[in-house]
Swiss-Prot record:
SUPFAM superfamilies: N-terminal domain of the delta subunit of the F1F0-ATP synthase. This is ATP synthase subunit delta. Belongs to the ATPase delta chain family. GO terms for molecular function: proton-transporting ATP synthase activity, rotational mechanism. It comes from Clostridium acetobutylicum (strain ATCC 824 / DSM 792 / JCM 1419 / IAM 19013 / LMG 5710 / NBRC 13948 / NRRL B-527 / VKM B-1787 / 2291 / W). The keyword Ion transport applies. Signal peptide: none annotated. F(1)F(0) ATP synthase produces ATP from ADP in the presence of a proton or sodium gradient. F-type ATPases consist of two structural domains, F(1) containing the extramembraneous catalytic core and F(0) containing the membrane proton channel, linked together by a central stalk and a peripheral stalk. During catalysis, ATP synthesis in the catalytic domain of F(1) is coupled via a rotary mechanism of the central stalk subunits to proton translocation. This protein is part of the stalk that links CF(0) to CF(1). It either transmits conformational changes from CF(0) to CF(1) or is implicated in proton conduction. It is a peripheral membrane protein. Disulfide bonds: none annotated. Its main location: membrane.
Length: 179
């Protein structure tokens, strides 16, 4: 929702993690915390309860997480509680992962096919995408029977749609225009 703010918080956490040489630990621990925030009924009740003060929420978080996560990450969580941004934790995690990929010159390519790509096809596609974007490619493979055949690739906002479904829809539009 507030992508710009999420990114600012994520960048701050990234820099602290990098400075303390605990970046991967922070990303993993924060990911687990976000999972808890989304799925643990008790934590949700505490976070969302209007009659529990922020200071009480902070005490509860201290009891839960102290000694289990790095102190600086705990301080970050407490800051999110204080600034009433704890509900934005998932967006912050998303931005944190994006920043990490950017800093390591990596990009995620969402690849949709009807059947899994062979290792040779993955290698070929990775080298072509890597040359185009000048980044290391990380595949996120999705099997999608609705595309009929071919390959759909999304890298950031760029889409390469080489699916049969897309080609059929394009032909249909052309044929309907001519009538």
């Amino acid at each position: 929702m507030y992508e710009f703010l999420d990114r600012r918080y994520a960048l701050a956490l990234y820099e602290v993690g990098e400075k303390n040489q605990k970046l991967e630990e922070y990303i993993n621990d924060f990911g687990e915390i976000v999972h808890l925030l989304k799925n643990d009924e008790n934590i949700n009740q505490v976070v969302n309860h209007p009659q529990i003060s922020t200071s009480e929420k902070k005490k509860i978080f201290m009891e839960i997480f102290k000694g289990k996560i790095d102190e600086k990450l705990l301080n970050f969580l407490l800051l999110l509680l204080e600034k009433k941004r704890i509900h934005d934790a998932e967006g912050i995690l998303t931005q944190l992962n994006k920043i990490s990929l950017e800093k390591h010159n990596k990009v995620v390519a969402e690849v949709r096919t009807v059947i899994p790509l062979t290792d040779n096809e993955k290698t070929t596609l990775a080298s072509k995408l890597s040359a185009k974007y000048n980044k290391i490619i990380i595949f996120k493979e999705i099997i999608d029977k609705t595309i009929i055949g071919g390959v759909y690739v999304r890298v950031g906002d760029d889409v390469i749609d080489g699916t049969i479904k897309f080609k059929l829809e394009s032909m249909k539009k052309v044929m309907l225009k001519e009538e």
